[in-house]
Amino acid sequence: MPYRASVGYTNQQGTLETSKYERGTLDLSLSPNFFDKHLTVNLNAKGVVTSQRYASGGVVGSAAFFNPTIDPYFRNDDGSIDYTTTNGYWNYGSGRGEDFTPNTLLGAGPLSQLYDRDNTARAKRFIGNAQIDYKVHGFEALRFNLNLGLDVSSAKTYDGVNPGSFQAYTDTEARGWGQYSWTTNFRRNHLLEFYANFNKEWDIHHLDVMAGYSWQHFYSSDHSVSYFNETHEQKGEDSRYPFNRQENYLLSFYGRLNYSIASKYLFTVTLRDDASSRFSEDTRWGLFPSGAFAWNIAEENFLKDSRAVSALKLRVGVGQTGQQEIGSNYPYLARYYMSTDVYKTYYMGSAGHMFYLTPGAYDPNIKWETTTTYNVGLDFGFLGGRINGSVDWYLRQTDDLLNSVITPMGSNFGNTVLTNIGSMENKGVEFNLNFIPVQTKDWNLTVGFNGTFQHTEFTKLNNTDDPDYNIQTGSITKGTGNLLQIHKVGYAPYTFYCFQQLYDQDGNPIQNALVDRDKDGKITQADRYMTDKSPNPDFFYGISLKLNYKNWDFGFNGHGSAGNWVFNDFASANSTSNIDINAGNLPNFARLVKKTGFTKANSGEQWYSDMFLENASFFRMDDINLGYTFNKIGNWKGSMRVAFGVQNVFVITDYSGVDPEIPGVNGIDGSIWPRPRTYSLRLNVNF
């Protein structure tokens, strides 16, 4: 019986002090077959145990702004460390020992963030799968497949601060000793999938028909409780409602038909009927059809024997898909949310205290988001495949977009609601090219390049087609309201909505001087403008190269984008020295402060200036590898490859932030966390 077993262990030190990650894995696979291979069984089981300690993400920024002339420790008169004041780590504030008063405006120092906070997590996960495939005896063209899956995980997270730390002295509930919390998370996913497949060839015909059923159940449970340090007094939990439990179901009936004639003309039709418990009974089901046709031109008689053309296929298709991954399991239900603040309770007499229950916003008519895609493509190959690739034109029209939007005052129970907001169009051209310019006995060179030109815009956002209707989104650190971007018809998602900066004759920005676009003599929200700039690139691409010479191999991979914009929120939030100077401290100023010389308090509008909006086009060399393979070492019949590699080699960009590739979709950069460069030396041995 075929089987495979493996054991793995990973121990990785983080970029920051105190951060680390450990993982242990165990895999087992069994693949028996019965009845002359008509019945095949695949059993897979994988167990994973992880342990991780997190370092505070704010420590990088804190260290960058910390005054380098200050001793990072509090000292006694004899030079020893004064552990009675914030555990010895220097922090902004006044007084010493128990009389220490923290400067909450400037926050904890970098050493306190690193060593006086303990945030650890331990997790266990099991992934199991059993797949049974049966080919009917005497009618082998028909087979049945049953797939059963289970994914279970549990995690426990500890997050707390040390007594006597800066963080403990800023805790209004437990001043001086602080508190900690335990959070437990449980996830379980069941899968049952069954399908029948009929595959038959006769003469010049090939028919492949499949019909199936899929059922999934997702369950989650979360529980969190906080304690005061030292006294271990429990708080923050209502024992009557100790857990947050949620679940959802996904049900599907589906079918697919593939039919080809002489391998020249290929037809495909698919149909899915999906149901999600995240929607009400009236909108739960979604029907999503698709169809495609391909013409294998290279198989036609006029090209079949061509030496120049080795492959040529024309493809056209249209199809629909549904989206229900919205992050909420009950968006159509009216629900109440319980307060977690022990000071916000109702006194219920002998029943004790009950936490506040607040109604949440909901949409009883929320339904599937539907995307219709039109595609025309051409696959090609020339000179025996030494030049090959594809080019595709596509148009994606998404209707009933699912998103959270701000609700008009008094129209719902909450400031935002998850609902269907309108339609969006995405169109473009994507291509993939591969070349083999050199191919000899000793030399082989392969070059690949792929790219996509795209344009995305909203085509509808409400039922009245109001051209001025918009949805504000995209929070930044400073400012009133904090929303920097707008969804609006005719513009790309997350288009930046800024004030226009004024500059002096030398090109330097003038603090709090912005363009009065409506010419009413004052700067108001009406002076903001649609910049027509968004984080969505006009073009993104990838490049690869692989070179072989005898036993040597060399290669690299890179990718990049053009036309994408990023708002440097870190620069915006730290664009003036006013806060630091007024706090009576002299830390390291941000580079932008030194450049602009801003010393006044920024106006509420200055934070939204387009001076912080930057072109984030870039090219990143992802990795470079060089290796050598030893095929013969004495009488040994195996082989050995030694390779050296570098990941995150370099980035070419005009963006002033640390990294033009920022997490998330809205293009707002509020972090200065660096991406590591990794050097590796690898040894692969084959027996």
Question: Predicted segment positions?
Answer:
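Acidic carboxylate motifs that coordinate Ca2+ or other divalent cations, activating on Asp/Glu
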Residues: 520
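Glycine-rich, aromatic-lined ligand/substrate-binding cores of catalytic
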Residues: 534-567
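Extracytoplasmic gating/loop element in the C-terminal half of outer-membrane beta-barrel translocons
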Residues: 111, 276, 506-508, 561-642, ...
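Surface-exposed beta-strand-turn/loop segments characteristic
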Residues: 1-6, 10-20, 92-105, 581-582
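A generic structural motif
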Residues: 11-15, 275-277, 437, 535-537, ...
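Calcium-binding motifs, dominated by EF-hand helix-loop-helix domains
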Residues: 513-517
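Extracellular/periplasmic, surface-exposed regions of secreted and cell-surface proteins
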Residues: 23-24, 29-35, 40, 44-49, ...
